[in-house]
């Protein structure tokens, strides 16, 4: 394998590095449109930090700098890297491609060395970030939360403010499956009531593609917060429930689908983080006398279609806002799968229960 591919792969991995906590990849097959307009069906693995995919017959693929999913191979050091062969569904492979994949090992993953190098980079950032930790959402009582609907300056939204108000607050939402509020009322045994104020759709200053790289995700959130202040007239002081000078948590919906279910590198991967970790000063984050810091961000749509996002991802990310960690395969040692609490746990695979996450599992007792 050509040596020039190694630094590109390092950039690929580190581009995903945040000290955030996010959702694991959707377990459902994803239909991804390659830049040549051919459709490839893949299974996405991993999380917002490091992710890869496999074809339905088990060959590992990576998304290269041109937006193509190509077959992954091992270099002379045993590290996972890109080939120059564009991946296709099994039934659409040319004879050249068939000959190539017949020589490949299935279900390749990043080497231990790659993962250690990656984790060391993340842990260093994490230690720096957590020194500025500014708190989270109350775990009991009746509390207010803000949801900001953020549209890019080159996209059109599908669902309305009223739709998301129902999604967050309506008793028996989605034919009795329940809203976000219903979910947390149930799993807290009536001890946590979250009343969410949903803004109008506000428009951020850049196109969707600008915010695609992980280094821009927090910028999207900050731009949405500023837009909520100027375009929607939000009074942020209403969302400091314990009067400590901090907004306890903000949920930001972005137009379109999330990368965890689209496999598209131009989409934001749902996650929970803090604007202070991204370098925004207290002055920049102060609105109406309170400071904005902790946030979650989730998609408007499930995958690349037109179906509204389900509550599973939102409930998982809010779990981080309450202080819960991830319980899926966060060290990538089992190819993105973790039997553990699995489908029984909101903070593991249980956020995807039901149809694409419309009936998420309760969180574990952590």
Describe the residue ranges of each PLM region.
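Bacterial N-terminal signal peptides that target proteins for export
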Residues: 1-8
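Zymogen propeptides/activation segments of proteases
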Residues: 4, 21-291
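Generic macromolecular interface patches on structured domains
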Residues: 7, 47, 234, 328-332, ...
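Bacterial N-terminal signal peptides
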Residues: 8-17
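Short, charged/polar micro-motifs that form catalytic or ligand-binding hotspots
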Residues: 12, 137-138, 242, 308-312, ...
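Extracellular hydrolytic enzyme modules, especially secreted metalloproteases
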Residues: 249-251, 255-366
């Amino acid at each position: 394998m050509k040596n020039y591919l190694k630094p590109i792969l390092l950039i690929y991995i580190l581009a995903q590095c945040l000290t955030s906590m996010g959702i694991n990849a959707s377990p459902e097959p994803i239909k991804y449109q390659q830049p040549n307009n051919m459709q490839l069906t893949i299974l996405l693995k991993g999380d917002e930090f490091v992710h890869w995919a496999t074809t339905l017959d088990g060959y590992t693929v990576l998304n290269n700098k041109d937006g193509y999913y190509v077959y992954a191979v091992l270099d002379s050091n045993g590290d996972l890297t890109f080939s120059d062969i564009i991946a296709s569904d099994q039934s659409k492979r040319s004879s050249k491609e068939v000959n190539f994949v017949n020589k490949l090992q299935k279900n390749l993953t990043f080497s231990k060395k790659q993962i250690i190098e990656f984790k060391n980079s993340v842990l260093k950032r994490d230690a720096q970030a957590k020194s500025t930790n500014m708190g989270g959402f109350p775990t009991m009582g009746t509390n207010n939360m803000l949801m900001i609907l953020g549209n890019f300056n080159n996209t059109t939204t599908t669902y309305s403010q009223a739709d998301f108000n129902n999604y967050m607050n309506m008793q028996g939402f989605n034919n009795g499956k329940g809203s976000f509020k219903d979910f947390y009322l149930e799993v807290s045994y009536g001890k946590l009531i979250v009343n969410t104020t949903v803004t109008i759709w506000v428009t951020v200053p850049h196109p969707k593609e600008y915010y695609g790289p992980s280094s821009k995700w927090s910028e999207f959130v900050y731009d949405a917060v500023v837009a909520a202040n100027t375009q929607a007239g939000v009074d942020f002081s209403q969302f400091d429930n314990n009067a400590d000078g901090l907004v306890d948590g903000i949920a930001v919906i972005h137009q379109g689908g999330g990368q965890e279910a689209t496999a598209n590198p131009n989409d934001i991967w749902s996650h929970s983080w803090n604007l202070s970790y991204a370098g925004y000063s207290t002055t920049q984050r102060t609105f109406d006398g309170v400071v904005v810091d902790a946030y979650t961000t989730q998609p408007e749509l499930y995958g690349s279609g037109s179906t509204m996002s389900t509550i599973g991802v939102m409930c998982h990310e809010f779990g981080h806002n309450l202080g819960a960690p991830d319980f899926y395969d966060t060290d990538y040692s089992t190819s993105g799968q973790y039997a553990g609490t699995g489908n029984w746990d909101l903070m593991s695979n249980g956020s995807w229960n039901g149809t694409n996450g419309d009936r998420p599992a309760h969180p574990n007792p952590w």
